[in-house]
Amino acid sequence: MTRKWIKKLQSYIGEFFASFIFGFAVYTSIIGSAQTGQSAGPIIVALTIALSGVAIIYSFCDITVAHFNPAITFSAMCFRRLPFFGGIFIIIFQVAGFIIAGLASVAVLPGKYKNKLEIARPKRVADNVSRGRIFGTEFFLTAILVYVAFAVGVNPYTPPKDEHGDQLDPDEGLTEGRKITAPLAIGFTLGFCALLGIASSGGAFNPGIVLSPMILTGTWDFWWVYLLGQFSGGLLGGGLQRFLLYKIF
């Protein structure tokens, strides 16, 4: 096996573990908050999502794309920030990581298997929440997340340089420092987006988070609404950053 293929395999495995850790954090915080009757449940979940996201990106960004979100990966593929077939494999490993995370979460917490997965499964929070509201919530939340991910990580602005490698505008050197804080920006975005969907879709904005409990329970209510909103929202967010809001020198 060549060095190139070893690096690719390491990247796929890294994305699997990044997705597993994120999924485990999300599912256990959701289930645990519900089981213990925490009135601050949404805050607990949002903080868990934000802090785990920051830790995962810092830990895995040297060996993999550290998306742990198929909507980000799909948008990166569509806008040629990621090879198509490589992106497909990354998404497969992401979903696998979330499925194992779902199983691990129900294994470590008390209660019946399916009851715990039903708690973790994204769903409308009230009967009067329509498909359109679920779609709209997931669409806009995913668009926001993917825009930020593109701006600071997937497709960040790169200051132009002359033939000697010097930046044409010395002040642009400050831009390079944003790469260090990119995980913080993405983590904060994960956190506040998690709070914005609590009255409608529950705020998933991640196809992997949606698919795992649905696959494990066999309950597919509104699955296409969630996925359509997330993938289309991701395309909007990525497209805006790539073609409209990318800095012009």
UniProtKB/Swiss-Prot annotation:
It is found in: Cell membrane. It comes from the Eukaryota. The chain crosses the membrane at residues 12-32, 40-60, 84-104, 134-154, 180-200, 224-246. One of its GO terms (molecular function) is water channel activity. Coiled coil: none annotated. Water channel required to facilitate the transport of water across membranes. Involved in osmotolerance. A motif (NPG) lies at residues 206-208. Gene3D superfamilies: Glycerol uptake facilitator protein. A motif (NPA) lies at residues 69-71. This is Aquaporin. Residues 33-39, 105-133, 201-223 are extracellular. Its main location: membrane. It comes from Vairimorpha ceranae (strain BRL01). PROSITE patterns: MIP. Aquaporins contain two tandem repeats each containing three membrane-spanning domains and a pore-forming loop with the signature motif Asn-Pro-Ala (NPA). In microsporidia, the second signature motif differs slightly and is Asn-Pro-Gly (NPG). Keywords: Cell membrane, Membrane, Repeat, Transmembrane, Transmembrane helix, Transport. It is a multi-pass membrane protein. GO terms for cellular component: plasma membrane. Belongs to the MIP/aquaporin (TC 1.A.8) family. Residues 1-11, 61-83, 155-179, 247-249 are cytoplasmic.
